[in-house]
Amino acid sequence: MCMDKLGTYLSDHLSGSIVAIDLARRRASSQGNDEFGADLRRFAAEVERDQRTLRNVIASLDASPSMIKELMASGTAWVDSLRSAINLPGAPNLVRDLELLIIGVRGKELLWKALAEIGIETDPPIRELQDRATAQLESLDVLHNLAVEKEFGSGRAPSS
């Protein structure tokens, strides 16, 4: 097993989880106590658990997370939050943010699959992590559908 490549791969996913947690928390806070806020708070807590598992895997392989990548992930999250706060053109919207989270969870599914394929054991077991990722995707997909309706309207475009 090529530990350098695996360590880099795991650090990339760790960085992604930092951005996802920040994005989910920020979006949950801006949504308040509506269905989006509650579900995104729950999602952020689940991703934090997944992140702890990933950190444990990295430690068990005697690899170290990349501080540079973690700082870059935190910086990216900060810039994105700043864009939202000052309402710049192209500032994130709920639909886009949910799509980013969906992409991230799909990547996480592939991470767990890759670890299973190379025989890495996790606690909780990989099957449980895969099931949680699948449930997260289903939940985010429902939220995405609701957000599309909320942000863009529910009617069909007029025919020409």
Regions found by a protein language model. Give the residues of each.
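Preference for long, well-ordered alpha-helical segments
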Residues: 104-160
